Amino acid sequence: MKIISSNRPIFKLILFAILLFFSGLIPSNPSKSHTMNSIISHEKHSLLLWELQYLPQKFFYSISEFIFPFENKKVSKKDPIEIIQNYIKINDQIRKHNNEYEYATIKGNDFKSNAEKEKIIQKYIDELEENQLITENALEEIISNTIQEFDISIFPNTIFPPVLISIEPPPSLLILSPRDEIKLEKTILLKSDNSIPQRYKIEGTIESLENKSALISDIGGLSTYPATVKVRSLESTHSTTAHEWFHNYMIFKPLGRSYFNNDKLRTINETAANIFGDEIAKYILDIQQNNNSKSPTSEPCKKPDFCFGLEMNETRTTVEEYLDQGNISKAEKYMEDRQKLFLDEGYIIRKLNQAYFAFHGIYADSPSSKSTVFEELTYLRNQSNSLADFIKKIENLSNENDYQKLVK
């Protein structure tokens, strides 16, 4: 794919003022409980403070490219994919050490990091910070270029809203659900740097005082403006960047503005964003590989292989059966046992409870979901002439009745 520059620094910065009012498609609802506020008051993530701290970096980097293009000539000649892959390699080293720590903590081991390892991790973190802005620029360029090829925008021949991202670690998310049913009752953004022991402490305190199911989870991205994107694999990073842009785009459409109306519309938004992000990412990957190799597709598990999707779906079904019977303690004991099973099979799930299923269930393509939205939207996408045609069909939805008419 030919990479062309579609970044317009000044335009992006002006648009920021507009989109700031709509930032954050994941709700950060104020708690009615004074007790809960006192528990999490020092851990809350402030979107406004983050914007004020981060925007100047983005502003000066964009201005420097605009005013002093020759200063960045050597960097600009680099392949954007190469820039992103280099960042991913550094990030993978940090994730490797963090995973070792998380696994040891979940298993209850006494994990003490030595000073030498901390120095190594800090070295990688410093490298990430040095490469952050150029990597963001590369991602914005690639995704903008691809969206333009798909002819998706509010205005003709213009990417609107412009793709603008931050690859700083997204905030974590406190998720609350009733114990007697799986329901996304409340979500609150927390700081990204809370430790695993801190998470257990906050969750335990809330569960005992509020009688709720609580979970603090990492998230893949947040549709602020700039959107926050968690860097993982190349395909995943492209997918998440496109996913968050989809939310920014939908802010200007009835579907996006209906996000909080009910759980069904939220699921439609998130699932459509996943379909969009995955298709954009696959297209980029196919171009990069010159169509010489096919993207791996998921196949049904063969016994005696452990199939995460099937096992998680079975877990969700069984938990709901217990809860429908009013047997909360049995459901919670079952989830504890299943969490240990997943951990033994190499899937690092720190905590499996009602809040876990309430959050992951809004993504209908997740094995944690019981929704039919993914199958319905996938069928609609397959019946559409193009990705742009698919988006035009769904962007004006604002209620469940219109959705049902569309997918019939």
Question: What label would you give each PLM region?
Answer:
Residues 80-83, 87, 230-239, 266-270, ...:
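Solvent-exposed, acidic/flexible segments
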Residues 72, 76-79, 184, 223-227, ...:
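Generic, low-specificity signal for short hydrophobic/alpha-helical stretches with a mild N-terminal bias
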Residues 1-150, 384-408:
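N-terminal low-structure segments adjacent to metalloprotease catalytic domains
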Residues 2-4, 9-12, 127, 138, ...:
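Charged, low-complexity, helix-prone segments enriched in Lys/Glu/Asp/Gln
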Residues 58, 76, 193-195, 233, ...:
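Alpha-helix initiation/capping motif
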Residues 303-408:
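Pan-zinc metallopeptidase signature
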Residues 93, 102-298:
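Acidic/His-rich structured neighborhood in mature extracellular/periplasmic domains
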Residues 54, 61, 87, 101-103, ...:
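Sequence-level detector for tyrosine residue identity
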